[in-house]
Each structure stands twice: as structure tokens, then as C-alpha cells.
């Protein structure tokens, strides 16, 4: 048996490296170059893991507490590629004691990949590092970006049978994945016995969540005889305590259908002057004039019965502009296939977007993530771990999995296409082909597919055209490529309409990585690196 000293620190027991150590294809090259065994193995780790780690538990004289928990790690982006630990560690040690630092490396060039993760011993040190070094000029003309790193341990799972309970879902998914700790499930407002067809699975840590995601997305695992829809959910971000200390708005959920804004105003006004009350489905926002009134109301009313339901109250999470920007980017990417969709943030009312009805182009709806309520309600994330924790979209964006005018109408007549600019374009349909649907009246110059459509100029829009005749499921005769459906493709699942899941933090790869585009990255890459491209 070959015996080797791997770590090079003090007296070591022999170990069988042939089975315990997995080397990359570059390991022999390093040995052939004359490098010592230990040095070659350390360098080979960079090829395998794609990172270089500094530190570990610091000496007891520096820190003798427990292992750091959530909120102690920061992400450092836009690092100059030729900058290493010898400059990063002294810089960040000024914010507090460091537990470890992981610098992502490019093994081919020996340079870093432009980002790193620093874990501090305390949350306070991590928050101080963000304040001190976000947009810090680390070299002349080179500014780094720093933010709290959030290890995502939640998965969105769609296509859940609506009759299943939280306990049944927890039991079923525990059979096929490891480390599942909780299930977050929402019920339909008008029928508390039924769920909304989706849930969130919470795992012990990001590593187990990533493994579960890969397993569930493999197509080999079926739950209740079906392959589910699985995506990353947005991770929970702890709000700034200084910001939360100023919040005067309460988020109230689990309201009965009979509860009105007038009832809420009467119930909460006894604790202080109200600026306004806004109820949406079975939740509401209560705006107080003073924070003291909001604090007192939450203490007195949380868990109390209101019109037959026990309400739950937390402070509403204020706007996070960076999260809104990320949401806008994800939403724009999700809707690239949709015609005439652009993101408009509150408080401006967006113009209506086209529905997906096929005859007469359907009715008009609003963008999928616009909820119709005023001003900044869309910004609130309801950061509460027992429901909707930290997620930006109110869960009513998933209501019955139907948003706006998404229904398919009958296909309209397939006549000549309109001219789209300065001059007539040739017709798209085949000459002499029969119409596909019944004729529809013109909507100005835009009507059913058989009629002429409006030019893409400054024409006058007239009345809406009717829907075309129903020829459900037939293919277009002229070879026109029909755009993909807005509905998520779920392998012919048959549990009713499918949900449109929260977008993952980046594309839909199956590796568990997100934020970075390298095949070498593993589960440790758990933050929003895409902010600093």
C-alpha cells in the first residue's frame, strides 16, 4: 500500500491515496514538471474544485464561538484577475475576524475568476464589510462590489395535486430527496382544503437543495406518478435592521373573504392613526402614521380571530432596488417570446399587452407580474419564513395558473398579413388557401386573422375584431412557426393547468449552479454574482 503525507502538517497517519484522492487529468503533468507531490496535489485541487480556500476556524484567541450561520458570508465581485488573498485578507480583516475566504480560480491561467466569498465569524462583521467595501476602489480605477451572500435552500415545485396536504407533500418528497426540513404550502382563498398547485421545499442547506434539484429535474424521479416542475426559488435576504426599524407598514395575511378594507380600518385604527389600508385577496397592507402604532397593533392583533380566521401579521419589507432590477431582468428574459411586452415598474401603469387568443389576437391583459395595485406594493417581499419568505412576487401571481388574457381562442382566418412599415410586404399565407376560421369583423384595420391587421405605424385603432372560428389543435398550413406557449412545459402532466414558476437566478441548467457560467463551479457558488459582470 502506498503511503503518503497529504497535508504536510505535523505527524500524519498513512493513507491509501489510490482510493481516497481523485486527481484530474492535469495531475501527472504537474508531477512531470518537477513539482513536489504535496504541491502538485494542492494545485490539482484548484483544477478539480475551481477555488482556493484560505483559513478555516480561526484560533481561539481570535474567535471561540460557534460556526458561522446564515448571514455571515459576503460575495465580493469585480476583483482584478491578478489580485489574490494576500491583498483581500488584510482588507476584509478590518471589518472583523474572518472564518474563511474562498477565491474562485481559473486553473488554466492561474488567475482568479473575478469573485470570491468571505465568511466572517459574526453577522455584524459581514454587514460592516458591506458598508465599508461595497464600491471600494481596491486599485486605481478598479472598484469591487460587495453584498451579503445568501445560500439558497428553497425549491419551487409546481404541478402538485391540489388535494395534497403539507404533511403528505413532506412525506412524499422526503422519500426521493434528502435533507428536506419544511414545506411551504398556500391554500386557495375560497377553499382552504385545497392548495394552489405549487409549494416550496426547504432544505438543510444549499448543497442538499442543489442535489435535490438535480435529482428532481433528472426526469427519473416521479412523485405521485408524475415528473414535477422544479426551479430555484428566490433566496431569503435578511433586510437591513436599520431600514426595518423605520417601517410603519404591516403585512396581514390569512384574511377571510368577508373582511373588507373598512373592517380592517376599524380594527387597526384603535392602535394609531392610519394613512391607508389596502386589501388584496386574502392579505392586506396597513399603513400607520407612526411606527409605535404599528408595533402595538402587531403585538395585539397577531394570531387573533378576525371574521372567523386567525390572522398573521409581520412588518412589510421595504423596497430593495437591486432585487427589483434583478426581477426586471428575469421577467424580461422570461417574456422574450411574448409579443409586445416590456417591463414597466411601479408607480407607472403599464400599457396593456396582447393576450394569447388566436382569433382576433385575443383580448388585452397586463404583464404577468403586474398586480394592479398601487405604487410600491409590488416592492414588498413579506420576509417571513413561514410563508412567502423573501419572495418578491405576491403568491397571487400564481392564482389558478391563469394570468391576464392567456386563454387560447379559436384560430382566426389566415389571410394576407399587413404591411409592417413603409411599404407593403408580400402576403405570408399561401395564395389560394382557404381560410382557417370563420371571418371576424375588423378592429379598425386590425381584426381577426382573416382580415387586414393594423400597420405598425400611427394608424387609428377602431373597434375590436371578433375571434376566429374554432379549429383547435390544427397546424397552420403555410409553415408558419407558432410561438411557444406561455405555459411551462411539464412533460404532459395531467393535474390541470400548470403554474408559471418563479424564475431561477440564472438559466435552467441542471447543475445546481447559478450566477456563474463555468462547468467547474459547485454548490458553493450561492450568490448573486451576476450583479457585477
From Swiss-Prot:
Instruction: List Omega-N-methylarginine occurrences by residue.
Output: 354, 406, 428, 436, 446, 449
Keyword terms:
Acetylation, Cytoplasm, Endoplasmic reticulum, Isopeptide bond, Methylation, Microsome, mRNA processing, mRNA splicing, Nucleus, Phosphoprotein, Repeat, Ribonucleoprotein, RNA-binding, Spliceosome, Ubl conjugation
Q: Where are the sequence repeats?
A: 358-360, 361-363, 370-374, 379-382, 388-390, 395-398, 408-410, 436-438, 449-451, 464-466, 467-469
Q: How is it modified after translation?
A: Phosphorylated on tyrosine. The membrane-bound form found in microsomes is phosphorylated in vitro by insulin receptor tyrosine kinase (INSR). Phosphorylation is inhibited upon binding to RNA, whereas the cytoplasmic form is poorly phosphorylated.
Give residue spans, biased composition: Low complexity: 414-432
**Residue ranges for motif Bipartite nuclear localization signal?**
474-488
- UniProt keyword Repeat, yes or no: yes
**Residues modified to Phosphoserine:** 69, 497
Role, per record: Heterogenous nuclear ribonucleoprotein (hnRNP) implicated in mRNA processing mechanisms. Component of the CRD-mediated complex that promotes MYC mRNA stability. Is associated in vitro with pre-mRNA, splicing intermediates and mature mRNA protein complexes. Binds to apoB mRNA AU-rich sequences. Part of the APOB mRNA editosome complex and may modulate the postranscriptional C to U RNA-editing of the APOB mRNA through either by binding to A1CF (APOBEC1 complementation factor), to APOBEC1 or to RNA itself. May be involved in translationally coupled mRNA turnover.
Q: What is known of its domains?
A: The domain containing eight Arg-Gly-Gly repeats (RGG/RXR-box) may be involved in RNA-binding and protein-protein interactions. It is methylated by PRMT1, and essential for nuclear localization.
The record's section on NCBIfam families has: hnRNP-R-Q
Q: What is this protein called?
A: Heterogeneous nuclear ribonucleoprotein Q
Tell me what organism the protein belongs to.
Rattus norvegicus
Q: Lineage of the native species? A: Eukaryota, Metazoa, Chordata, Craniata, Vertebrata
Amino acid at each position: 500500500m502506498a503511503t503518503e503525507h497529504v497535508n504536510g502538517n505535523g505527524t500524519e497517519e498513512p493513507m491509501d491515496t489510490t482510493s481516497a484522492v481523485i486527481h484530474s487529468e492535469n495531475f501527472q503533468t504537474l508531477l512531470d514538471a518537477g513539482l513536489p507531490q504535496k504541491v502538485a496535489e494542492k494545485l490539482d485541487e484548484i483544477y478539480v474544485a475551481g477555488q482556493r480556500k484560505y483559513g478555516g476556524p480561526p484560533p481561539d484567541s481570535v474567535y471561540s464561538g460557534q460556526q458561522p450561520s446564515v448571514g455571515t458570508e459576503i460575495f465580493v465581485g469585480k476583483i482584478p484577475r491578478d489580485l489574490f488573498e494576500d491583498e483581500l485578507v488584510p482588507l476584509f480583516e478590518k471589518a472583523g475576524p474572518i472564518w474563511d475566504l474562498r477565491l474562485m480560480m481559473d486553473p488554466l491561467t492561474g488567475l482568479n475568476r473575478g469573485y470570491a466569498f468571505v465568511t466572517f465569524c459574526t453577522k455584524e462583521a459581514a454587514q460592516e464589510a458591506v458598508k465599508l467595501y461595497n464600491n471600494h476602489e481596491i486599485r486605481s480605477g478598479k472598484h469591487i462590489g460587495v453584498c451579503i451572500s445568501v445560500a439558497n435552500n428553497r425549491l419551487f415545485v409546481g404541478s402538485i395535486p391540489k388535494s395534497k396536504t403539507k404533511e403528505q407533500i413532506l412525506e412524499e418528497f422526503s422519500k426521493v430527496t434528502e435533507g428536506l426540513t419544511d414545506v411551504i404550502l398556500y391554500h386557495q382563498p375560497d377553499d382552504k382544503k385545497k392548495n394552489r398547485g405549487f409549494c416550496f421545499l426547504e432544505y438543510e442547506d444549499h448543497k442538499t437543495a442543489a442535489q435535490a434539484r438535480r435529482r428532481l429535474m433528472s426526469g427519473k424521479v416521479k412523485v405521485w406518478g408524475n415528473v414535477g416542475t422544479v426551479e430555484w426559488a428566490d433566496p431569503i435576504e435578511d433586510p437591513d435592521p436599520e431600514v426595518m426599524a423605520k417601517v410603519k407598514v404591516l403585512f396581514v395575511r390569512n384574511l377571510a373573504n368577508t373582511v373588507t378594507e373598512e373592517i380592517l380600518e376599524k380594527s387597526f385604527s384603535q392602535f394609531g392613526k392610519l394613512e391607508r389600508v389596502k386589501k388584496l385577496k386574502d392579505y392586506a397592507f396597513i399603513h400607520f402614521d407612526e411606527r409605535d402604532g404599528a408595533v402595538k397593533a402587531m403585538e395585539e392583533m397577531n394570531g387573533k380571530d378576525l371574521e372567523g380566521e386567525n390572522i398573521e401579521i409581520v412588518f412589510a419589507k421595504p423596497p430593495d432596488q437591486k432585487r427589483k432590477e434583478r426581477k426586471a431582468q428575469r421577467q424580461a428574459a422570461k417574456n422574450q417570446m411574448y409579443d409586445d411586452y416590456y417591463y414597466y415598474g411601479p408607480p407607472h401603469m403599464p400599457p396593456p399587452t396582447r393576450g394569447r387568443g388566436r382569433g382576433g389576437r385575443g383580448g388585452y391583459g397586463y404583464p404577468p407580474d403586474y398586480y394592479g395595485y398601487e405604487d410600491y406594493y409590488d416592492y414588498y417581499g413579506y420576509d417571513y419564513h413561514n410563508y412567502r419568505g423573501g419572495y418578491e412576487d405576491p403568491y397571487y401571481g400564481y392564482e389558478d395558473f391563469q394570468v391576464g388574457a392567456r386563454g387560447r381562442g379559436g384560430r382566426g382566418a389566415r389571410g394576407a398579413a399587413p404591411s409592417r412599415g413603409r411599404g407593403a410586404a408580400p402576403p405570408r399565407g399561401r395564395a389560394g388557401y382557404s381560410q382557417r376560421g370563420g371571418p371576424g369583423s375588423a378592429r379598425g384595420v386590425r381584426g381577426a386573422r382573416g382580415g387586414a391587421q393594423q400597420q405598425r405605424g400611427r394608424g387609428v385603432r377602431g373597434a375590436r375584431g371578433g375571434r376566429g372560428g374554432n379549429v383547435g389543435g390544427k397546424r397552420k398550413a403555410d409553415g408558419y412557426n407558432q410561438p411557444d406557449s406561455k405555459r411551462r412545459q411539464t412533460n404532459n402532466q395531467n393535474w390541470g393547468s400548470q403554474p408559471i414558476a418563479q424564475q431561477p437566478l440564472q438559466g435552467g441548467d441542471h447543475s445546481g449552479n447559478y450566477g456563474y457560467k463555468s462547468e467547474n463551479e459547485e454548490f458553493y457558488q450561492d450568490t448573486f454574482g451576476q450583479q457585477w459582470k
